[in-house]
Regions:
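Flexible loop linkers connecting adjacent transmembrane helices
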Residues: 4-8, 14, 47-52, 69-96, ...
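Membrane-interface loop-to-helix entry segments
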Residues: 119, 129-179, 191-193, 209, ...
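C-terminal membrane-solvent junction of multi-pass transporters and transport-like membrane proteins
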Residues: 317-326, 363-417, 445-457
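Helix-loop-helix junctions that connect adjacent transmembrane segments
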Residues: 9-10, 15, 52, 128, ...
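TM-loop-TM module centered on a large, flexible mid-protein loop between adjacent transmembrane helices
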Residues: 82-86, 91, 122, 233-295, ...
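Hydrophobic transmembrane alpha-helices that form the core helical bundles
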Residues: 42, 64-145, 150, 286-307, ...
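Membrane-interface "cap" regions at the ends of multi-pass membrane proteins
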Residues: 1-50, 62-63, 67, 79, ...
């Protein structure tokens, strides 16, 4: 085997067909998901009626946390995910970190499966939450094994139904608020002080920034460096209305003690909606949000792990596919990772905190790589759509890394010592494996990040 490591950037494709509206719909679908219907109650346990303000803070912090990605999207066409970014801008060894982190990120979907179990339990009270959660994941696993991605062709429709359902619920719910959620001196406001308020915001932040993933559609966008950033940033006002409004409704209809800590938004919904409308809302809103998010885990993990195997980070044997074209070994591994926290009775909060800890190293590595844009592509950087100087980029990247670091520290101190130590040990071990394989050689990486020459031809 050739002992040299090689990075090959694929040729830039011609501009795609996705326009601004298409990209916005994709971005909305990526961010409006199960987090909003599972974390408000637990966050309220930290901060009381000020949970709506904590969600607002989470949205603002989340924006600055992922803004470097959006800046990148306004400078380059990107299609290969974090793996392409770090290998193209920072080198081979960083690619190993991203590739291996993707092996453990499915753990977050355990919380989505638990959420599905909780909501289905309201329709099927005779079956336990754990059984419903496990059954839901296994059914989606089997459907994906059969090559039946049941949401692929209708994702835009489902996202539209979900968006309309949640907007209508928030608009109606805001007229039903009965609790003093705007009384800033009330005894149920800021119940945990500043610490509790920040714990709530940092718990909610992961559900409030997924729109940046539209960046990976740079290959398919017609005007990537213009429309991708626009689509991502246009999600922020939507989140401010839907998420903050939902937190107001969830925390403002019933007394504090009936809602704080509850892992669904159903107590308030059941209080203000008639029976049949309540059930329709539960299916069209929370359950749809959870299923579409949960189903996505298989493809979200499939492509990064498959690429890592092709490039030499993982055994190529895991690429085996069944007769339906599904990589059954990768899917089986993903299923196991998702099921383990459910089997061991971990809570939503614990799962979220573990996820934030294990993704810290990858996130900081990606942001650092983005900060190298002016050095790696000086001419393209001068044309960035935000008209930022290099110093401006460094400032935003520094702010992002600070926020990621705060979340990491919060995560470490918010979970059991054994979980914290295990998470850090796993990530350090994966980093060392990546360094070892880099030194050993034989890694051949294909990246998909381009200076937008083809796009500029059409302007």
């Amino acid at each position: 085997m050739n002992d040299k490591n090689i990075i090959v950037n694929k040729p830039e494709p011609k501009p795609g067909i996705l326009e601004r509206g298409d990209l916005f719909a994709i971005a909305v679908g990526m961010v409006i998901g199960s987090g909003m219907v599972t974390l408000i109650g637990p966050a309220m346990a930290y901060t009381g009626y000020s949970v709506w303000l904590a969600y607002l803070t989470a949205i603002v912090m989340g924006f600055f946390m992922v803004f470097p990605y959006i800046i990148l999207g306004g400078t380059m066409r990107v299609a290969g995910g974090p793996y392409s970014i770090v290998t193209n801008l920072s080198g081979v060894s960083t690619g190993g970190l991203v590739a291996y982190t993707k092996l453990v990120t499915p753990i977050l979907n355990s919380s989505f499966a638990l959420a599905l179990g909780l909501y289905l339990n309201n329709l099927l009270p005779g079956i336990t939450v754990k059984a419903l959660a496990i059954a839901g994941v296994v059914i989606l696993f089997v459907l994906n094994l059969l090559g039946m991605d049941i949401f692929a062709k209708v994702s835009k429709i489902l996202s539209t139904v979900l968006l309309i359902t949640m907007v209508l619920y928030v608009v109606f719910g805001l007229t039903q608020i009965r609790q003093p959620i705007f009384n800033f001196s009330g005894d149920k406001m800021f119940t945990g002080g500043f610490k509790g308020f920040m714990l709530a915001a940092l718990l909610l932040i992961n559900s409030a920034n997924g729109y940046y993933n539209v960046l990976w559609y740079g290959k398919d966008a017609k005007r990537a460096t213009k429309d991708v950033p626009f689509a991502a940033m246009s999600c922020v006002p939507c989140l401010l209305f839907i998420y903050v409004g939902l937190a107001m409704v969830t925390g403002g209809v019933l007394p504090h003690d009936e809602v704080a800590g509850v892992e669904t938004i159903l107590p308030a919904a059941q209080e203000i909606l008639p029976g049949i409308v309540y059930k329709l809302f539960m299916i069209g809103g929370p359950i749809m949000a959870i299923i579409t998010t949960l189903n996505g885990v298989f493809n979200d993990v499939r492509y990064p792990i498959a690429q890592a195997a092709k490039d030499g980070w993982l055994p190529k044997g895991i690429l085996k596919e069944n007769r339906f074209g599904a990589p059954y070994l990768i899917y089986t591994y993903t299923l196991i990772v998702v099921l383990l926290p459910i089997i061991f009775d971990m809570s939503f909060v614990t799962i979220t905190n573990i996820f934030q800890v294990i993704t810290f190293f990858m996130n900081v590595t990606v942001v650092y790589a983005i900060s190298r844009l002016p050095k790696k592509y000086p001419d393209t950087w001068k044309k960035n759509k935000f008209h930022l100087s290099s110093a401006g980029l460094y400032v935003f990247c520094t702010i992002s890394i600070i926020i990621y670091t705060i979340i990491f520290i919060k995560g470490i101190f918010s979970i059991k010592l054994v979980y914290a130590v295990s998470a850090v040990i796993v990530m350090v071990a994966l980093i060392l494996i990546g360094v070892y394989l880099t030194r050993k050689g034989g890694i051949r990486i294909e990246t998909s990040i381009w200076q937008p020459a083809e796009e500029e031809k059409n302007e």
